[in-house]
């Protein structure tokens, strides 16, 4: 006789899809730092029950993307709830210290191994900029750097780097709100790719170091600027379409 297992009340895949939709919204800046999150509103906008939303929010809290909100209301009706966790320039600088070390190493190794970076990676990034599609810009950025990690020939580099990318992509979502920072990113990527394709490891390493330094500085400055304009957590919840779960 087979073992009796409890029925799953909610599909793990659905909770994961909700998690990814919310993470994308946080990364793209649709859900802003300090913004309060309510299960009811999110569930209604995504056309799902509250349970997968609850599970997704628990994961987002564990991963550091959301946190307990300040208590509001009187003693009788006070409510804590959740809010999007804030970002700060000091924190992102620390993340970039780690990312820079990994990216510089990966780039040097990729160039020394005769790697050819697919020009479509650059074209995709520039196309995303033209479409004003922040999510696509972030995805293209990750694809470019992942190509370098894999070309390095050391799987530990990719494994280590990708641990930080969920937080990096969120910081990118903040920084890319400024259109002035978008094209220069891909100019730097293209220069790095050209150096790698030429097999010039020293130049590729130098360009990647400069790229990481620029990214850290620009993101920190943009986050400080954005933080000044963030309300006290009462901003309206953006519209998230249920159809996003089907992509």
Model features per residue range: what roles?
Residues 2, 78-79, 85-152, 180, ...:
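All-alpha effector-binding/dimerization core of bacterial HTH-type transcriptional repressors
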Residues 121-127, 173-247:
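C-terminal all-alpha effector/ligand-binding and dimerization domain
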Residues 1-112, 224-247:
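Short linear motifs at protein or domain termini
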């Amino acid at each position: 006789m087979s073992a009796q297992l409890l029925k799953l009340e909610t599909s793990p895949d659905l909770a994961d899809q909700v998690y990814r939709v919310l993470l994308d919204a946080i990364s793209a800046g649709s859900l802003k730092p300090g913004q309060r999150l309510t299960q009811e509103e999110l569930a209604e906008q995504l056309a799902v029950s509250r349970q997968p939303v609850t599970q997704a929010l628990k994961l987002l809290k564990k991963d550091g993307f959301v946190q307990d909100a300040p208590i509001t209301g009187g003693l009788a009706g006070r409510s804590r709830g959740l809010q999007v966790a804030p970002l700060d320039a000091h924190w992102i600088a620390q993340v970039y210290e780690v990312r820079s070390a990994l990216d510089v190493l990966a780039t040097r190794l990729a160039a020394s191994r005769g790697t050819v970076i697919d020009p479509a990676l650059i074209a995709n990034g520039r196309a995303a900029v033209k479409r004003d599609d922040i999510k696509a810009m972030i995805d293209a950025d990750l694809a470019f750097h992942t190509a370098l990690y894999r070309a390095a020939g050391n799987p530990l580099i990719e494994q280590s780097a990708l641990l930080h990318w969920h937080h990096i992509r969120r910081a990118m979502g903040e920084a890319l709100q400024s259109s002035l920072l978008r094209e220069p990113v891909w100019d730097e990527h293209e220069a790095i790719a050209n150096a790698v394709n030429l097999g010039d490891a020293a130049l590729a390493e130098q360009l990647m170091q400069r790229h990481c330094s620029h990214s850290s500085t620009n993101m920190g400055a943009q986050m400080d600027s954005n933080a000044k304009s963030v309300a006290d957590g009462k901003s309206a919840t953006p519209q998230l379409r249920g159809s996003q779960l089907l992509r």
